[in-house]
Structures are given as C-alpha cells and as structure tokens.
Amino acid sequence: MTEKKYIVALDQGTTSSRAVVMDHDANIISVSQREFEQIYPKPGWVEHDPMEIWATQSSTLVEVLAKADISSDQIAAIGITNQRETTIVWEKETGKPIYNAIVWQCRRTAEICEHLKRDGLEDYIRSNTGLVIDPYFSGTKVKWILDHVEGSRERARRGELLFGTVDTWLIWKMTQGRVHVTDYTNASRTMLFNIHTLGWDDKMLEVLDIPREMLPEVRRSSEVYGQTNIGGKGGTRIPISGIAGDQQAALFGQLCVKEGMAKNTYGTGCFMLMNTGEKAVKSENGLLTTIACGPTGEVNYALEGAVFMAGASIQWLRDEMKLINDAYDSEYFATKVQNTNGVYVVPAFTGLGAPYWDPYARGAIFGLTRGVNANHIIRATLESIAYQTRDVLEAMQADSGIRLHALRVDGGAVANNFLMQFQSDILGTRVERPEVREVTALGAAYLAGLAVGFWQNLDELQEKAVIEREFRPGIETTERNYRYAGWKKAVKRAMAWEKHDE
C-alpha cells in the first residue's frame, strides 16, 4: 500500500478557488488557484455561479496533484475551508442550482432585515445565534431565494431542494450527492443555528419560513464526512475529514486554540477572531459570538469582528480608480509621502461591519485640500484597514475583559510592511506575522489530518508556528489617539448616507 504522505486543503474563497498540498511537516508542496466571475446584477448585489465555483475548485484539485507530481493514493485526507455565509439552493435530483449563489457581501436582503428588527427579534437573534441582524448572514438570503424563485418553498418542503453554504455544496458534489453536511463553524454563520443547543433553531426557521427538510446535518469540524474519488470512477477514494469556515480555519491554523488568543486575517475583508474557550461571550459592543475549533476540532466559542472592505479597497484603487497597477504598488506609493496630509478614506462601499453594523453607510474621502495627491489617498486607504482593525479590537477587549498582548496576522495584505507597521502603531500592540502565510489552508489541513491520525495532536504542530517578523509600535500614545480620533470623526460622517431623508 502506498504511504499516505500528504494532506490537501481546498480553500474556496470569494474571488478564487485554491488547492494546497502539504506534507507531514506542514510544508507547502504545491498550490493551484483559479479565479471566477463576480456577478453584480444591481448596485449592492453580489452573486457567484455555483457551477463555476465547483468547476474551478475541482480543477484546482486535479492541477495541484499534477503540479506536485504526486498520485492521489498518497493523499491521506482532504480538508475544506470556504467563504462563509454565501448561500446556495439546489435540486436534490439533478444537482442544479435554482439560483446563483448569493454572496456574503450582497446587501439585497436589507429590507428583510429591517422587518426582523421591526418585529423585535434583535435580542432573540443575538442571544441564540450570536449574530446581529444584517444581510451578511445566510438566513435572509435563503428566504430571498425561496420568496423569488417560483414554487421553490413548496419544493423545499417536499424535500426536493437542498440548502448549503459553500462547504456543503462542495462536499455534496465531491460525494456525488451522497453527503449533505456542514460543520458547526459554518452553521453558526447562517442565523438559523442555535449556538448553545448546537441545533437548527425552530423559531428562526419559522420566522424566515425556511423548511427544515432542506438543511444539512451539522457535524464537528474534524471527522470523516465521506469519501471522494479523485480521477473519476474507479479512482482513489480519499476521506474528506475537515471543514471550517475560512476565518475559523485561519484561527486554528494560527494555533489560537486557547482562550484569549486572537488573529486578524487581511483578505477581501478583515476578520478578527478571539478564542473565548468554552464560554460563549455575548457582545455588548457590536461583535459576533461565533463557533470556533478547540484543540481537536471540538466546539469552542469566539468573538468576531468583521470589516467588509480591506483588500477590496486596494482592488478599488487598482481597478476603479486606476491609481495603482497592482496591490504591491500600494506600499511603494504610500511610503512616498510622510503622512496622509489630513486625509481619511472610509471604504464603506457596502456599508460598515463591526462594530457599527450600518448597511446604509457609504464610502467617503474626508479632509481633502489642494495639496492632496494620489499618494496621500493611497496611503489613507491602506491606513483605513488598520483603523477598522482597531475599531474591532477595542470592542473585543471591552467584551472579553482580555488585554491583547500580540495580534497574529495572516492573509494577502500582511506582505505589506507599511500596513503591518502602521497596524502596530495604531493598536499600540505587537503584530506577529507567521512564516507560513497560508494559515487558512493550514487550518483546514490540520483539521483533516487530525481526524485521520495523520497528526496525533496539536502538540506535534506547535513548532511549526514560526513567527517570521514582529512589528512593534513606533509612535507615541498622544499621536496614536489624535489620529484615531480623526478616523472616528470620518466614520461618523459616512454613516447612514444611503438612508433616504424623510
């Protein structure tokens, strides 16, 4: 029998599908990535084609093995991590989606959310699901699809339609429709799941009129869910044995499995999570209470703050504003000036996430004077990512009562040394950048490997968490507070912009 030497992590993100092969020492052997189309039918609406998600993800799996020149029978297990909240409804018989995937960033369900608020459900939802009422989460998206695709609610009741987040969709496709599951971390993002009883919440299903028949079974983040054939029928059968939403996977990949440990991921958005152990801390400061993974993939809780626009604001500088040619340019131009010349950019293109939760905020640039040039705006856009992170960290420390001593960071933007240094400056906290940047994939690989005994426990993995560089604060407290006060003022003015004046 061939020795099982590798784990594959599938990392299905918002803009691309990736596959990563890792060996027993958690070294990355090969990576394959394919981008797919972002669909914007109306302002504020965002969709993906679920078949394209599947096509890009399945082709990266084949590609990554070919690139590494390894055969599928050397793979011990597959772990899956995914963009969370994105919602897919498909036909059980044919496997065909009845509508495009409604993406986490999509704001089309703002009105449904207003109704939930008017019906006085905020406290119930916060207490039982850990979430705030916002279009971000899957529940209102499922309702929207069932409301708008004729006959779909009746079909769902008859058991003809299935709902899933992206992890569920991928596993369903990989197992030829044999397995309809999700894990606790993804379920905790739907607004349909009770994070205390660890079951689907009857009241939420009733309120949103979502038939229970269409929901997946919820399982631990580290166990064998089913097998997939690589290379079609008769190919090698490989266990799929790890699932976690991207942010929880990154938390696990950073080995933040003890209470009080935190990480910030700088991707399309920014996501900060702090592990709170076995205690679900209810936030009084606009954060989410969510499910994370303990040392063996069991249920832990975490506080989470989501910033919607991080890397996406750099893409805006590149694609819409044409101020830079690629993301790497942003650091070069930002360091061409000493400061932002009084400019603040509030990148609230799709509203504001934690701790404000204002779907009606819109992007704005404040403090423009005649001397402001493109470099100042580029620098201010980068700084906005760090300011938003501080907003979240302040809320997190207030809720948890824990003063953070170091923030572990990951995601594409951490390669930007200017941003990481400014992040440390504005937080007044050490920022630790790990050597392995692929921590989301790492988390999925760890969860999958632990389930099949590829690794015995997390102690084996501790020495792999090498910090490549540590950034320390380099500005005075008064300067830090002065700059942050300017940011708060700018945010205040960008809020409620889209609300029509009565």
From Swiss-Prot:
Residues annotated as binding glycerol: 84-85, 136, 246-247
Pathway: Polyol metabolism; glycerol degradation via glycerol kinase pathway; sn-glycerol 3-phosphate from glycerol: step 1/1
Example of a GO cellular component annotation carried by this entry: cytosol
Molecular function per GO: ATP binding; glycerol kinase activity; metal ion binding
Keyword terms: Allosteric enzyme, ATP-binding, Glycerol metabolism, Kinase, Metal-binding, Nucleotide-binding, Transferase, Zinc
Entry binding sites for sn-glycerol 3-phosphate: 14, 84-85, 136, 246
Entry keyword Nucleotide-binding: yes
Keyword Transport listed: no
Binding residue positions for ATP: 14-16, 268, 311, 315, 412
Gene3D superfamilies: 3.30.420.40
EC number annotated for this UniProt entry: 2.7.1.30
Catalytic activity, as annotated: glycerol + ATP = sn-glycerol 3-phosphate + ADP + H(+)
Coiled coil: none
Pfam families: FGGY_C, FGGY_N
Regulation: Activity of this regulatory enzyme is affected by several metabolites. Allosterically and non-competitively inhibited by fructose 1,6-bisphosphate (FBP) and unphosphorylated phosphocarrier protein EIIA-Glc (III-Glc), an integral component of the bacterial phosphotransferase (PTS) system.
Entry-linked SUPFAM superfamilies: Actin-like ATPase domain (SSF53067)
Single GO BP term: glycerol metabolic process
Binding site for ADP: 14, 18, 268, 311, 412, 416
PANTHER family the UniProt entry points to: GLYCEROL KINASE, SUGAR KINASE
Sequence similarity: Belongs to the FGGY kinase family.
HAMAP family: Glycerol_kin
NCBIfam families the UniProt entry points to: glycerol_kin, PRK00047.1
Function: Key enzyme in the regulation of glycerol uptake and metabolism. Catalyzes the phosphorylation of glycerol to yield sn-glycerol 3-phosphate.
Subunit structure: Homotetramer and homodimer (in equilibrium). Heterodimer with EIIA-Glc. Binds 1 zinc ion per glycerol kinase EIIA-Glc dimer. The zinc ion is important for dimerization.
Full protein name: Glycerol kinase
Species the sequence originates in: Shigella boydii serotype 18 (strain CDC 3083-94 / BS512)
